[in-house]
Amino acid sequence: MYRALRLLARSRPLVRAPAAALASAPGLGGAAVPSFWPPNAARMASQNSFRIEYDTFGELKVPNDKYYGAQTVRSTMNFKIGGVTERMPTPVIKAFGILKRAAAEVNQDYGLDPKIANAIMKAADEVAEGKLNDHFPLVVWQTGSGTQTNMNVNEVISNRAIEMLGGELGSKIPVHPNDHVNKSQSSNDTFPTAMHIAAAIEVHEVLLPGLQKLHDALDAKSKEFAQIIKIGRTHTQDAVPLTLGQEFSGYVQQVKYAMTRIKAAMPRIYELAAGGTAVGTGLNTRIGFAEKVAAKVAALTGLPFVTAPNKFEALAAHDALVELSGAMNTTACSLMKIANDIRFLGSGPRSGLGELILPENEPGSSIMPGKVNPTQCEAMTMVAAQVMGNHVAVTVGGSNGHFELNVFKPMMIKNVLHSARLLGDASVSFTENCVVGIQANTERINKLMNESLMLVTALNPHIGYDKAAKIAKTAHKNGSTLKETAIELGYLTAEQFDEWVKPKDMLGPK
């Protein structure tokens, strides 16, 4: 249902019915207002751009055009860290929408008023679809449990549901952010649940498709270059021959293994903490709530989510995210190697290795006319470096779960999602703007191969290692060819050299 929703939609205009309409709404009147609230506490300030809302610490001004409430405003006041670029990642917010919808549906099964439940579900759907993104201003750098973001979601869904039912924003009547939207939930189990939902969706919609695209393009190049024999390099020095296709096949296998590692980490990501509430005991939930919520989330996303078998682990440790981040870190190592190889093999065009001709995408220098650079390789290697750094942060966060709760949750999921998005997007960019357009410079490849001293390795079985080494060293010292030197030293004839030193016969075991 939600898997294809990626574009941000504009928030709906706020249309509010008079508060009096609430009292006349069948089945919705009579909800109590907390005794510490002044009369008409949530009434709009008619001459101002804000309304007054209350939390347990007192009153706060809330912008009239926002669905969030007092706790969200208080968080924006207390955590002015980083600005808009550090806001909670959109995938987390959308994941919360999915979770809150699932919870409302299950709570209805356990007796929640259907009118309230349906309004919550409709509002939660809008959150999941990205229609209310402008109402989530909180940054990652807040409480380590993500409580403020959970309440931000609760307030937005509550007020949007209230609006749908003709009520007054901020009144918490008939839909209360805690009693109804957060029913049978705690921030301690909802935030890790949203983390796993967001990570799983990002992996399936962005990361794995990007890697698959790169894998297929590299595989096509490996087949295209299957007959091109080139000199190999070890320690960055000349080695024995292989085909360019064989070289690329190594890259293909690296990306294949990357996808395998990521998929292998996913079963733990599919385990959801929902139902554990505050410390993992499931206090204030009903028997079966956790299983039903996981099943609803699975149905909504099309992914095989299940309830976590041990909620204490699910709240206090986030080893599953560390594991996934580790798989992405290994992927970054692979992509760093692949991108570096390709840019070095394409170095030049006249003074480098020059074995590959890379696509020319844009001017490369503001001072050197005609210069073109391997920018896609550079972007990929920067992405790889960033992912490696992200993994360090995730590792530190994952190792700091204390007693019954890990309080590095927002930072961890920010970095996991960042890595997944960067690797997926970079793989697509690298594929479309570099890999598919790579050409082999066969003239240069042949020249370098025929000049290589390491072809002498083919003589080992015939004249022995020591004599072969002397041929190579003498040829290098004198600037002569292997063939000329071998004949001059009297180790073999021209005919023997031509018979034994054939690059095409040096590509595999005999």
Curated annotation (Swiss-Prot):
Transferase in keyword set: no
UniProt xrefs under SUPFAM superfamilies: L-aspartase-like
Biological-process GO terms, alphabetical: arginine metabolic process; DNA damage response; DNA repair; fumarate metabolic process; homeostasis of number of cells within a tissue; malate metabolic process; positive regulation of cold-induced thermogenesis; positive regulation of double-strand break repair via nonhomologous end joining
E.C. number(s) listed in UniProt: 4.2.1.2
Sites bearing Phosphothreonine, chain numbering: T85, T90, T236
pH-linked activity: Optimum pH is 7.5-8.0.
GO molecular function: fumarate hydratase activity; histone binding
Disease connection: Fumarase deficiency: A severe autosomal recessive metabolic disorder characterized by early-onset hypotonia, profound psychomotor retardation, and brain abnormalities, such as agenesis of the corpus callosum, gyral defects, and ventriculomegaly. Many patients show neonatal distress, metabolic acidosis, and/or encephalopathy.
Protein name: Fumarate hydratase, mitochondrial
